[in-house]
């Protein structure tokens, strides 16, 4: 059975606009504006199922109001001092003041006449400035500025100050380390003065003035050469006692072997202190007696010694004393190492340790190392240029340090 169609209508979706709307649009241009009916807008499609409407966020009055700054407290009643307002405090610059001891022992590197021309005090200035003035004063007062300049420690980084020295026809500059305290300045100068063999040259406190201090220091300077050539009786006695303490323990040893020429000179010096020869022609030993009448306990042998008159001790003690010419060839010409020649250095190294350093003495003669060069030697230089191993190099550095600390 077929359904009857409506004429003039197609199959499919119905039109969006109704007939009334079509008529209104058709008559839009022909009719007047007053007779045009209102145009209706089709509805939008509805929301999907399970769609939730979000509630609008309500802005609170606090959030809508502009931000307010926290009221600052009233500081008018608070005392304005450094505790409450630290930003207003002006830091005070650190200053250092050093005093120069013109009566100190200047050592072999510095010249006393130039030292007397220096001011009594350096500063007050910044630590770096005072350190520069002190080191420059040491270089200016030196006999040979090149040696003192080589002992100055090189600095790096930060604020640098430099010192200068003129030698070999050129002007040489060297930067000093960064310093920021009084203690560092004193430690740096202490190490430098120890290398220059002139202790107690600088201090942060004034030196006590003495009337005869300058005269005594000058007498020590003038008599240094004579005291190096001729030893007094008191020095020989003190050296003999010191050697007996370490090398003449007769209560525990039956015999004593003398391996050092220095020990032979000291034992021969005992007989000269007694005023006569060490032994008689019959071979019996006489105890040395000083002028005071009582015998020295450091030189007297104990009665319980089993070999008091034995051949081992008597053979060494009765050895003929060497002539003055032989003694001069054995010991350096002066006690001041800065005046030593190459041969003096060779004798010093040979006497210091015959077993460890004796085979290497020719190297010092080959490289022409005199007294000044000996004081500048370090372990790395000895191993690199002289070819010594670490053990002999450390032993030699030990003897050089003892030589630097000795008073000439």
Curated annotation (Swiss-Prot):
Gene3D superfamilies: SLED domain, Transcription Factor, Ets-1. GO terms for cellular component: nucleus. Residues 274-338 are annotated as: Disordered. InterPro entries: PcG_chromatin_remod_factors, SAM, SAM/pointed_sf, SAM_Scm-like, SCML2_RBR, SLED, SLED_sf. Residues 278-287 have a biased composition (Polar residues). Keywords: Nucleus, Phosphoprotein, Repressor, Transcription, Transcription regulation. Residues 288-306 have a biased composition (Low complexity). Residues 340-406 form the SAM domain. The modification Phosphoserine is found at residues 55, 65. SMART domains: SAM (SM00454). Pfam families: RBR (PF17208), SAM_1 (PF00536), SLED (PF12140). Its main location: nucleus. It is found in: Nucleus. Belongs to the SCM family. Putative Polycomb group (PcG) protein. PcG proteins act by forming multiprotein complexes, which are required to maintain the transcriptionally repressive state of homeotic genes throughout development. This is Sex comb on midleg-like protein 4. The gene is Scml4.
């Amino acid at each position: 059975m077929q359904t009857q169609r409506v004429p003039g209508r197609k199959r499919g979706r119905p039109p969006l606009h109704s007939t009334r709307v079509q008529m209104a649009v058709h008559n839009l241009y022909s009719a007047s504006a007053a007779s045009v009916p209102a145009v209706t807008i089709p509805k939008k499609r509805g929301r999907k199922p399970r769609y939730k409407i979000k509630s609008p966020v309500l802005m609170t009055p606090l959030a809508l109001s502009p931000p307010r700054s926290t009221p600052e407290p009233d500081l008018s009643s608070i005392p304005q001092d450094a505790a409450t307002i630290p930003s207003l405090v002006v830091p005070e610059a650190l200053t250092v003041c050093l005093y120069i001891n013109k009566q100190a022992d200047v050592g072999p590197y510095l010249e006393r006449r130039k030292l007397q021309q220096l001011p009594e005090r350096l500063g007050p200035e910044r630590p770096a400035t005072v350190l520069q003035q002190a080191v420059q004063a040491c270089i200016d007062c030196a006999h040979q500025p090149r040696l003192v300049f080589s002992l100055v420690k090189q600095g790096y980084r930060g604020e640098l100050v430099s010192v200068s020295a003129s030698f070999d026809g050129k002007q040489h500059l060297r930067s000093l380390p960064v310093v920021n305290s009084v203690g560092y300045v004193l430690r740096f100068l202490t190490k430098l003065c120890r290398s220059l063999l002139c202790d107690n040259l600088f201090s942060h406190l004034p030196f006590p003035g003495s009337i005869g201090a300058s005269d005594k220091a000058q007498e020590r300077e003038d008599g240094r050469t004579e005291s190096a050539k001729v030893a007094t009786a008191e020095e020989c006695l003190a050296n003999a006692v010191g050697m007996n303490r370490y090398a003449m323990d007769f209560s525990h040893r039956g015999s004593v072997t003398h391996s050092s020429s220095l020990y032979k000179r000291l034992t021969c010096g005992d007989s000269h202190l007694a005023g006569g020869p060490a032994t008689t022609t019959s071979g019996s030993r006489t105890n040395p007696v000083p002028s005071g009448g009582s015998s020295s306990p450091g030189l007297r042998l104990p009665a319980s010694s089993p070999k008091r008159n034995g051949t081992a001790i008597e053979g060494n003690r009765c050895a003929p004393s060497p002539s003055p010419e032989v003694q001069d060839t054995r010991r350096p010409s002066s006690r001041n190492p800065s005046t030593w020649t190459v041969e003096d250095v060779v004798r010093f190294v040979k006497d210091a340790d015959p077993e460890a350093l004796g085979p290497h003495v020719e190297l010092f003669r080959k490289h022409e190392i005199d007294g000044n060069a000996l004081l500048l030697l370090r372990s790395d230089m000895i191993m690199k240029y002289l070819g010594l191993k670490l053990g002999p190099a450390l032993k030699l550095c030990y003897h050089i340090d003892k030589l630097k600390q000795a008073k000439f």
